[in-house]
Amino acid sequence: AGIDIRLRRIFGEDGKTVICPLDFGGFMGPVEGLFDPSAAVRKVVEGGCDAILVNPGLAATEWESYAGKAGLVLRVTGGSTKFSPNPTFHTLVCSVEEACRLGADAICIMLLVGSDYEQEMFEIMGQVVSDSHSLGIPVLAEVIPCDPSHSFEPEWISVCARVGYELGADAIKTYCTSEGFEEIVKACRVPIVIAGGPKVEDPNSVVRRAMAAGAAGIAFGRNVFQAPDPTVKVRELYSIVHEDCRCK
């Protein structure tokens, strides 16, 4: 029951979600749109996002901006900074118990498919899933190709989604392919939330295509917090994810 209760804080009654990742500072440092953490959180929460995805430090200092207004997905893994010569391994940086103390509604863990460190990340994910489920906390697994050139290839994304599901995640965060995504969704028995990736010219059309293909929502960072008005952008995306789907 605990897992289902917490998932309801992330996904609406329609089973859809708009998550705003604000975790880029953990590896990129202060970037455009996130120089002021308080303002960044406030803007996306005012837009009506279902949840935010952040690192432990931001969760601890900015809780008054989101508590009771948006769900908290806490990232517990980290790999490197933008200066690292080897950014292909993500290790545990926060325990599940600490995530609980910070009020997490869900745990987020990274798995890079095709990395030289797949085995180590598999082991970490297995332990995190076990620890989280023992405490009634759901896991959102961000499973993406290690090599960005494969980010939108159906074969790679199919493996990413299915592997995350098979390892026990309650939801998957990965990319939406331009073709074959419906079959990827069918082969994954847990919700798939679409990662935003780099900024694109028309994120709204990307979301419409993903939702039509069976996505359970989005987790858009740069396409939201670097928008001219993040609050307005969240409202637009929320309408597409929730209202547009409800009208079908």
Per-region residue spans from a language model:
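N-terminal basic/disordered segments at the start of proteins
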Residues: 1-12
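Alpha/beta enzyme core
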Residues: 12, 17-194, 200-220, 231-244
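A short, acidic, flexible beta-alpha connecting loop/helix-capping segment that sits on the rim
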Residues: 222-228
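Flexible, glycine/charged-enriched surface loops at secondary-structure junctions
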Residues: 246-248
